[in-house]
Curated annotation (Swiss-Prot):
Stated consequence of mutating residue 367 to N: In NEDHYMS; uncertain significance; mild decreased editing activity
Cofactor binding note of this UniProt entry: Binds 1 myo-inositol hexakisphosphate (IP6) per subunit.
Tissue: Highly expressed in brain and heart and at lower levels in placenta. Fair expression in lung, liver and kidney. Detected in brain, heart, kidney, lung and liver (at protein level).
Any GO BP annotation: innervation
Signal peptide: none
One annotated Gene Ontology cellular component of this protein: nucleolus
Location of region: Interaction with substrate RNA: 83-88, 104-105, 237-242, 259
Phosphoserine: modified positions: 26, 149
Binding-site residues, Zn(2+): 394, 451, 556
Domain A to I editase: 370-737
Protein name from the UniProt record: Double-stranded RNA-specific editase 1
Outcome of mutating residue 603 to Q: In NEDHYMS; decreased protein stability; strong decreased editing activity
Entries under Pfam families matching the protein: A_deamin, dsrm
Amino acid sequence: MDIEDEENMSSSSTDVKENRNLDNVSPKDGSTPGPGEGSQLSNGGGGGPGRKRPLEEGSNGHSKYRLKKRRKTPGPVLPKNALMQLNEIKPGLQYTLLSQTGPVHAPLFVMSVEVNGQVFEGSGPTKKKAKLHAAEKALRSFVQFPNASEAHLAMGRTLSVNTDFTSDQADFPDTLFNGFETPDKAEPPFYVGSNGDDSFSSSGDLSLSASPVPASLAQPPLPVLPPFPPPSGKNPVMILNELRPGLKYDFLSESGESHAKSFVMSVVVDGQFFEGSGRNKKLAKARAAQSALAAIFNLHLDQTPSRQPIPSEGLQLHLPQVLADAVSRLVLGKFGDLTDNFSSPHARRKVLAGVVMTTGTDVKDAKVISVSTGTKCINGEYMSDRGLALNDCHAEIISRRSLLRFLYTQLELYLNNKDDQKRSIFQKSERGGFRLKENVQFHLYISTSPCGDARIFSPHEPILEGSRSYTQAGVQWCNHGSLQPRPPGLLSDPSTSTFQGAGTTEPADRHPNRKARGQLRTKIESGEGTIPVRSNASIQTWDGVLQGERLLTMSCSDKIARWNVVGIQGSLLSIFVEPIYFSSIILGSLYHGDHLSRAMYQRISNIEDLPPLYTLNKPLLSGISNAEARQPGKAPNFSVNWTVGDSAIEVINATTGKDELGRASRLCKHALYCRWMRVHGKVPSHLLRSKITKPNVYHESKLAAKEYQAAKARLFTAFIKAGLGAWVEKPTEQDQFSLTP
């Protein structure tokens, strides 16, 4: 092989090898190495085999080599200001200096730019800033911003990415508002939300104003930026402070266990009072400011679709997030009061639930009706054939039974005398019986998603850091005051409606059509968790359970879905009152709109032929701003319950369904049947919604509620037709008891 061939073969490695400092391996005297040395140290240069590359003139005794470049660490993409954004939309614009005034040390420049035949002027202490202001005015001409002059100044004209101050983060994300994109064609904006049928997440371009965007401005569409670290920006407190300087934030309260504190801060803006809660005061201030920005300046935060509240189809008297946070705070605060600020041994819990009642539009008037804890069911050997044991001690089930006690109390209050009728939540119905007074609503709070279908597919809180949507520079302002087309079933409240930018990565339910979705599930006896129902397990027998068969109890998701059809009043109370439904279901953690809405009502949307006044209730579904921390450790074997009017909590052994002394609970079937019998003796027969003569046996009294039983039958049929399984009922012997000894 000749020298030329060897040079060609080694040329590919020359760039790398020539970066070496050969001075380290050369003789110190500069003499030429021998053949042996050259063969070992040859770098493929032109000196031939066994020879080093000769030093070049001017090298000062050193081999000539290129310094290795350091690889730059990629930093955050710098934000695009209005000038850059306008140049991308309309390249080649000419800016003209109109005037320069003021003293030498403080000049004022005025620049102008012509866009689509319209001239926009901007002023500033430098030509650059004057051009920037002119570009901003040009952008505003075709992107409609309410309160643009104030808010754009406060935003500092930074690129923004989607963030969520309702997340479970202690520190604020750097930026607040979503950017805008120029769509290919003008489309009216819509509200983005989520329901069980169709999960809407805007992954395409959105028009930002009701007026059509000129075709000349709509081309070319701006590309979606890939994920990148968010640039520095301003949090809600900073923005609100620039819009309304000098605001004072007040500390209202502190609640919660030591590992899951919740602070409440307030601020008054333009005479309006706003509250915010968070795991620290800083976060609580931010959420109070966020509420003010939404209400007064119409500035709304983005949320990933699965975390957005899903509004009710009925009367909605409150702003969803405000209501959710208030209900959560009230239930947690009451539980703290009942357990000596969480220091009592019975404050230990896995799940906390409660029912809150509102009687108007002001959540300040909300009242806690019941509070409960618990995660376990009765052991089959402790079943009672006299209705003296609680079968299901899960917190949300106990809270609903506590609510029944309150309803009986309110009925008795109405039946006492005319003066007490005004204080009762009930009034006579023109259709017979009683109904709730106008604007009386009940809200169910659960510290985590209910067991069963709602929880099984959303076992973790979403990681919001990886679930942001990125759009082009600019600020997106959502003018929800104007009438905009909106898909049915999505957000109807402007304060919670948000536009989603392209690229939202947190998925909704990726596999909504899988067979496992929506299946009826049963709880595990004396344990936690649920399993799907078996096709042949719809009937349980008393002797079979006593001989060792597992006692099956339907999951909380399934029971709440049942309440959304037959009502929360149950069969006995339905003889007196019209169906009562929860107006909202609020989760303290593990909220996922798609899974929760499916579990609560979407999976039985095929239900039909319901009796009069019965319906498929679709309550408000929402998480809370400050998601509750996970409760670690083993679940306690006890359940706690309290109803308004009680002096103290009642502690029940979930395994036996009775208290530690073996006494029956005030929530057991026997106790509630006693309350029903007492009310039945006071209600005139013409006010009964279902006629029943000489009630004696608990089971027969329940069957007398004909319309309720018909609605329940339609519900069970809907589950079967949807292929979700058959409802598993308890052994009938449990209900074959009377109050007479």
